[in-house]
Amino acid sequence: MALPPQYSERSVFTGLITDIGELIGHEGGRFAIRSRYAAASIPPGASIACDGCCLSAVTVRADGAGSAFTVDVSNETLSKTTLGSWQVGRDVNLERALRAGDELGGHIVSGHVDGVARILDMRPDGESLRVLLELPLHLAPYVAPKGSVALDGTSLTVNEVAGTRFGVNLIPVTLTQTTWGRKKP
């Protein structure tokens, strides 16, 4: 199926979360998510990053002041992400695909997830929250101090790296406008 001309087959994102959606259902590989995005703004085939994973809207309907949309998730995606463990009611970081002329305030994020990091520790650090994570060994060479990472779709700067462990800081706005404020080690 060809996508509408305003969408390319290679969508990119910024890692700046624009909504926190809610998983309202899933059956097999089809997931349904409620969002504040207007239904009319999401044509079938539109790319939406769901916790950083680029997924294509299959069906879209109005839902209150926002929308509910479905996405199909492949076995490959389930093997590289946390989507297989999602339960109804779960909050999901959402971001629409970047369009020409949009502000690029985070960093270029492909939405192609390479693996899952594990939260080891979270502790206050001034006005921010310091998070220590561990990633799979095969990804360690790609994480560098002061480099960018996307975690649950959120663009973050790496503070330090030690082997497979790395740290980031979450500022207050990130904690309130993403799902990061609800996470625990």
Question: What spans do the regions from the language model cover?
Answer:
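Conserved loop->alpha-helix
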Residues: 2-185
